Curated annotation (Swiss-Prot):
GO terms for biological process: adenine salvage; AMP salvage; purine ribonucleoside salvage. It comes from Pseudomonas paraeruginosa (strain DSM 24068 / PA7). Keywords: Cytoplasm, Glycosyltransferase, Purine salvage, Transferase. This is Adenine phosphoribosyltransferase. Its EC number is 2.4.2.7.
Amino acid sequence: MIFDEFTLKSQIRAVPDFPKAGVVFRDITPLFQSPRALRMTVDSFVQRYIEADFSHIGAMDARGFLIGSAVAYALNKPLILFRKQGKLPADVLAEAYQTEYGEAFLEVHADSLCEGDSVLIFDDLIATGGTLLAAASLVRRLGARVFEAAAIIDLPELGGSTRLQDAGIATFSLTAFALDER
């Protein structure tokens, strides 16, 4: 399927003042209600990464799980789950980070990766970059390396993709929105 940014953007709903005043939330649930848009999204990532040299896909809680798991399945790669604090049952490593809403903690199972593994980290969007930077730190603490950070949406005005690139992490997104774009 040929990528069509207009179709993709038309399936991402802008929700003003959610979860707090002044924030425009980018709701991707309509994308999942459109089989065409979902297939285009997954296929676009699969085409980009089909011949790439990485060993695992790491998906961010919770919306990163949705596309990350589909791409991991299509590429036959192991899926590593990065969860919000207190959601994983076994031994974990944790990393504090700042979001656009406040401080949070990201966790991963301590046995998820091995020395030398290479991880494509996935989230639904790149805003401040805090979640993906925390995931990258956890990947490195486990002895692995970050291949790239990928997302459906980039919000470049919030600086996350720049922060990731400044930390030596390549980024890729299917589309970008200006903060005031509806």
